[in-house]
Swiss-Prot record:
Originating species: Naegleria fowleri
Gene Ontology MF: a single term: proton-transporting ATP synthase activity, rotational mechanism
Key words, A-Z: ATP synthesis, CF(0), Hydrogen ion transport, Ion transport, Membrane, Mitochondrion, Mitochondrion inner membrane, Transmembrane, Transmembrane helix, Transport
Disulfide bridge partners, by residue number: none
Species lineage: Eukaryota, Discoba, Heterolobosea, Tetramitia, Eutetramitia
Keyword Mitochondrion (UniProt): yes
Transmembrane segment boundaries: 2-22, 29-49, 59-79, 94-116
Assembly and interaction partners: F-type ATPases have 2 components, CF(1) - the catalytic core - and CF(0) - the membrane proton channel. CF(1) has five subunits: alpha(3), beta(3), gamma(1), delta(1), epsilon(1). CF(0) has three main subunits: a, b and c.
GO cellular component: mitochondrial inner membrane; proton-transporting ATP synthase complex
Cellular localisation: Mitochondrion inner membrane
Name of the molecule in the record: ATP synthase subunit a
Free-text function comment from the UniProt entry: Mitochondrial membrane ATP synthase (F(1)F(0) ATP synthase or Complex V) produces ATP from ADP in the presence of a proton gradient across the membrane which is generated by electron transport complexes of the respiratory chain. F-type ATPases consist of two structural domains, F(1) - containing the extramembraneous catalytic core and F(0) - containing the membrane proton channel, linked together by a central stalk and a peripheral stalk. During catalysis, ATP synthesis in the catalytic domain of F(1) is coupled via a rotary mechanism of the central stalk subunits to proton translocation.
Amino acid sequence: SFFYSLFKGTYNFIYVTIYSYLVDRTKMFFPFFFYLFLFICLSNLVGIVPFSFTITSHLNITFSLSFLVWWATCLLGFYESGLAFIAIFYVKGIPFVLVPFWALIEVISFIFRSVGLSLR
């Protein structure tokens, strides 16, 4: 049927996309990304209906989604890497004197990624 083909095509598209990034861990992350994609896609499709609006046009929804993804990234990073996750804030090749200042800038930019993502 048409709906089965539509669903299976969407399923395969998302699976192949995730597989290209997370080869051996696709099955672990697939449900999260699949339902996130469906939620955003279907929420935006509701906006096509006359006299309705998309819930993704509201800042509280987009901020909540980006904050959820940001926290999931942080928690998974600490779970997988432990304290070595903090190494993402260190940039190789900068003078030793600038390391604390640069790390502070990196932490602030990492925190504000969710805000920037929600404002898109």
